[in-house]
Curated annotation (Swiss-Prot):
Organism lineage: Eukaryota, Fungi, Dikarya, Ascomycota, Saccharomycotina
Pfam families: AhpC-TSA (PF00578)
Record key words, sorted: Antioxidant, Chromosome, Disulfide bond, Nucleus, Oxidoreductase, Peroxidase, Redox-active center, Telomere, Transcription, Transcription regulation
Inducing factors: During the diauxic shift. In response to oxidative stress.
Principal location class: nucleus
Comment on pH dependence: Optimum pH is 6.5.
GO BP, one annotated term: cellular response to oxidative stress
Protein name in the entry: Peroxiredoxin DOT5
Record-listed E.C. numbers: 1.11.1.24
Length: 215
């Protein structure tokens, strides 16, 4: 009987040791990390739509020297629709100067520079100011500064984008000027100061005028 008791004791100890070993080898359970919810709703969808629109607009090829003016129409300060193609059909030389925002200091210097040189420029070219400002802002700007030329409103920056004068895909315009001769882009000046824009545009217009005399 003593031998049987010792045998059962050894079996019980071995069984307990085996259970302890198995518990050591058992995989450690980790708490489940909750999945991050993706935000949805009108605001999220609206932001996504803006980004998608910006990406589409940034894919548009910029006009290069020699390219024809696009067939677009923009509103001027009087809310009249102006066809860009008709402008170039009626004028051999057309100057478009782009300014970031109406009635700001740098843009006022640029616009007034073209105003002060307008009498000479208009002998050879048509001059247009261009920005993403509203029609109302353009009218106030024109009236306050006595600007003798039209200001075109391009709130979606369609023409501004084609000219390569967008500051970012989402907003902003870069100060610049562009000169079309016989409907095609001849001069392209981007990221320049107000004074350089006026002076260079004047030189370029006079240069074209001299070539016309040789024809």
């Amino acid at each position: 009987m003593g031998e049987a008791l010792r045998r059962s004791t050894r079996i019980a100890i071995s069984k307990r040791m085996l259970e302890e070993e198995e518990s050591k080898l058992a995989p450690i359970s980790t708490p489940e990390v909750p999945k991050k919810k993706i935000k949805t709703g009108p605001k999220h969808n609206a932001n996504q739509a803006v980004v998608q629109e910006a990406n589409r607009s940034s894919d548009v090829n910029e006009l290069e020297i020699g390219d024809p003016i696009p067939d677009l129409s923009l509103l001027n300060e009087d809310n009249d629709s102006i066809s860009l193609k008709k402008i170039t059909e009626n004028n051999r030389v057309v100057v478009f100067f782009v300014y970031p925002r109406a009635s700001t200091p740098g843009c006022t210097r640029q616009a007034c520079g073209f105003r002060d040189n307008y009498q000479e420029l208009k002998k050879y070219a048509a001059v247009f100011g261009l920005s993403a400002d509203s029609v109302t802002s353009q009218k106030k700007f024109q009236s306050k500064q006595n600007l003798p030329y039209h200001l075109l409103s391009d709130p979606k920056r369609e023409f501004i984008g084609l000219l390569g004068a967008k500051k970012t895909p989402l907003s902003g315009s870069i100060r610049s000027h562009f000169i079309f001769v016989d409907g095609k882009l001849k001069f392209k000046r981007v990221k320049i100061s107000p004074e350089v824009s006026v002076n260079d545009a004047k030189k370029e217009v006079l240069e074209v005028a001299e070539k016309f005399k040789e024809e």
